[in-house]
């Protein structure tokens, strides 16, 4: 039985799983087949536990499909497979694989200042907030992959996920994860040189270096860190000199296996005003989206925040707030802080009626902004169709998919029941609305385009 069995499994898993999941969890695995046992080697315990928990049934099912009763036993281990296996497979692959053109890349010459006399030890401004850790980051379906990727980077900086690019709307937890990674790296190695900053700080530092004729010191500082964490990379847009310098810094860090993590409010290729060569490099490692939190995650965030403040928040109150404030975590926490402050000032118990009063203007604004009519108008404009098409009986995909999207958004962003949503879409049955919601949820898992459409529309409607 040859190791091509695992290659067959990989091919099927790549077809069946979303690309991000496959790249994050399956691709790093190494395999060794011996004595009717398939050993899968994971780079660390975190990956091993995740794969065994999430994909064990998938892998066993494929082994049974390919081998029937002769399927090998499956064993998981942390580490790498024996070197002899790697050499053997490399030789086999080189013989069996079709020849491909060999591209040789010249090693970049080291900057002249590298050959100068030893420089004084640099002092690093970490700027990592110790309050933001993985332990106090509330995980949900909307951010699960992003948290898992960040955790892996913290455990193995400079490894497979370099760079790590996190993107999503404002207030969804990207910055929290950046700090959590920084804290994780420094917890494992106390003297690690970890630098967190907003992209504008990089620009400001470069401008000062140019003004003070200290650009070589600037380069040495940024190219000698162990991990560079840059928030809101989209602010590099149209800053050509900054992009040029960051391009070379990026290359130097990657060459040195130093970790880079970037965040943005949009997918790399959608960042206008940034050079294509930079956008291409942003996607070299792993790119993960953070979605707006679903209801259960919003409730969990409120409960955890209340607990941190030693406040007892009744479950029904948390659900009341979470159902009405949906756009981002920052808005949720701000609303809860307001409720807590009002309760402390007045000495009153936190009830639904009290919350209605404390958040009166915020709730009124939210209800005014997000209506089914507004959703229909926004979706129609986004997909360049007519509102009448959404209400019609037409079933062509160019109309049906936007209609399903609008129904799913109505369920997510309003307090209307399924029958009420159905009535607003040409008198459709509530089961049609339920099917639309489930279909969009499924497509968000499978299609990057649908996921992006949903996030863009949520952002537009919640702004």
Swiss-Prot record:
Name the residues that bind ATP: 171, 173-175
> Does the keyword field hold Nucleotide-binding?
yes
* Entry protein name: Chromosomal replication initiator protein DnaA
According to the record's subunit comment, the protein's assembly and interactions are: Oligomerizes as a right-handed, spiral filament on DNA at oriC.
Family note: Belongs to the DnaA family.
**What are the boundaries of the region Domain III, AAA+ region?**
127-343
Major site of localization recorded for this protein: cytoplasm
Record's Gene Ontology CC terms? Answer: cytoplasm; plasma membrane
Q: Which PROSITE patterns match?
A: DNAA (PS01008)
The record's region (Domain I, interacts with DnaA modulators) falls at 1-90
Tell me the function of this protein.
Answer: Plays an essential role in the initiation and regulation of chromosomal replication. ATP-DnaA binds to the origin of replication (oriC) to initiate formation of the DNA replication initiation complex once per cell cycle. Binds the DnaA box (a 9 base pair repeat at the origin) and separates the double-stranded (ds)DNA. Forms a right-handed helical filament on oriC DNA; dsDNA binds to the exterior of the filament while single-stranded (ss)DNA is stabiized in the filament's interior.
Q: Where is this region: Domain IV, binds dsDNA?
A: 344-463
Q: What is known of its domains?
A: Domain I is involved in oligomerization and binding regulators, domain II is flexibile and of varying length in different bacteria, domain III forms the AAA+ region, while domain IV binds dsDNA.
Q: Which UniProt keywords apply?
A: ATP-binding, Cytoplasm, DNA replication, DNA-binding, Lipid-binding, Nucleotide-binding
Q: Which GO terms describe its molecular function?
A: ATP binding; ATP hydrolysis activity; DNA replication origin binding; lipid binding
The encoding gene: dnaA
Pfam families documented for this protein: Bac_DnaA, Bac_DnaA_C, DnaA_N
- GO BP terms, alphabetized: DNA replication initiation; regulation of DNA replication
């Amino acid at each position: 039985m040859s190791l091509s069995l695992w290659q067959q499994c990989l091919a099927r898993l790549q077809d069946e799983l979303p690309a991000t999941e496959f790249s994050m969890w399956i691709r790093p695995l190494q395999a060794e087949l011996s004595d009717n046992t398939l050993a899968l080697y994971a780079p660390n315990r975190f990956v091993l536990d995740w794969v065994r928990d999430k994909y064990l049934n998938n892998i066993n099912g494929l082994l049974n499909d390919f081998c029937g009763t002769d399927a090998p036993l499956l064993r998981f281990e942390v580490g790498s497979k024996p070197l002899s296996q790697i050499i053997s497979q490399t030789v086999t692959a080189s013989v069996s694989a079709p020849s491909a053109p060999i591209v040789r890349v010249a090693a970049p010459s080291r900057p002249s200042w590298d050959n100068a006399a030893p420089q004084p030890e640099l002092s690093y401004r970490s700027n990592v907030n110790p309050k933001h850790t993985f332990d106090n980051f509330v995980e949900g379906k909307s951010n699960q992959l992003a948290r898992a990727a960040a955790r892996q980077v913290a455990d193995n900086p400079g490894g497979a996920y370099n760079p790590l690019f996190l993107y999503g709307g404002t207030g969804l937890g990207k910055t929290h994860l950046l700090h959590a990674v920084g804290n994780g790296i420094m917890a494992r190695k106390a003297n690690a040189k970890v630098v967190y900053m907003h992209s504008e700080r990089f620009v400001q530092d470069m401008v000062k270096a140019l003004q003070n004729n200290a650009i070589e010191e600037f380069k040495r500082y940024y190219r000698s860190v162990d991990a560079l964490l840059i928030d809101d990379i989209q602010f590099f847009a149209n800053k050509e000199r900054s992009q040029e310098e960051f391009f070379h810094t990026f290359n130097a860090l990657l060459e040195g296996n130093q970790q880079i993590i970037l965040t943005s409010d949009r997918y790399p290729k959608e960042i206008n005003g940034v050079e294509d060569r930079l956008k291409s490099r942003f996607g070299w490692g792993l790119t993960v989206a953070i979605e707006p939190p679903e209801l259960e995650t919003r409730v969990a965030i409120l409960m955890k925040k209340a607990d941190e403040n030693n406040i007892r928040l009744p479950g029904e109150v948390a659900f009341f707030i979470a159902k009405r404030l949906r756009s981002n975590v920052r808005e949720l926490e701000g609303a809860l802080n307001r409720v807590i402050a009002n309760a402390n000032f007045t000495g009153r118990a936190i009830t639904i009626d009290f919350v209605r009063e404390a958040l009166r203007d915020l709730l009124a604004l939210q209800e005014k902004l997000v209506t089914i009519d507004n959703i229909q108008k926004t979706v129609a404009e986004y997909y360049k169709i007519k509102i009448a098409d959404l209400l019609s009986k037409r079933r062509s995909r160019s109309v049906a998919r936007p209609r399903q999207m609008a129904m799913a958004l109505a369920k997510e962003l309003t307090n209307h029941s399924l029958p009420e949503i159905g009535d607003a879409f040409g008198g459709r049955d509530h089961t049609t609305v339920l099917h639309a919601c489930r279909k969009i949820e499924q497509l968000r898992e499978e299609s990057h385009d649908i996921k992006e459409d949903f996030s863009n529309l949520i952002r537009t409607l919640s702004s």
